[in-house]
UniProtKB/Swiss-Prot annotation:
InterPro entries: Cell_div_SepF, Cell_div_SepF/SepF-rel, SepF-like_sf. This is Cell division protein SepF. The lineage of its organism: Bacteria, Bacillati, Bacillota, Bacilli, Bacillales. It comes from Geobacillus sp. (strain WCH70). The keyword Cytoplasm applies. It comes from the Bacteria.
Amino acid sequence: MGLIKKFKDYFLEEDYEEYEEYEEEYEEEEEMRQATKANTKSNVVSLQSVQKSSKVVLIEPRAYAEAQEIADHLKNRRAVVVNLQRIQHEQAKRIVDFLSGTVYAIGGDIQQVGTKIFLCTPDNVDVTGSISIDSDDDTSMKRW
């Protein structure tokens, strides 16, 4: 009888250990599934928070030195309307050149929306449509 008991104990313990290992693996898989579900839920971003943070800044610079302030707004993902009507043409041209480089670097866009008025937008702002500018005014004939 001793030999039969040893066989039973040997085989029953092995089955029991295998069962425990299987049980642990199952629990680990279940925990991984729950962790994956939690990760996918945290990747959701509310569209309302994105829409509320969008801003448009209006700036009428008096000197070329203010171009950096405009570029900072663009870097912070804000659209900027720049009115260059009260600045000398040469300085206005330099500002437009500087802002053109800025919007290129951030993947944005710059558009003329009026005589000496420009709309600079970062990559998170889409502008659709176009505005035709009258070429009757002598100042609009000058090339930027």
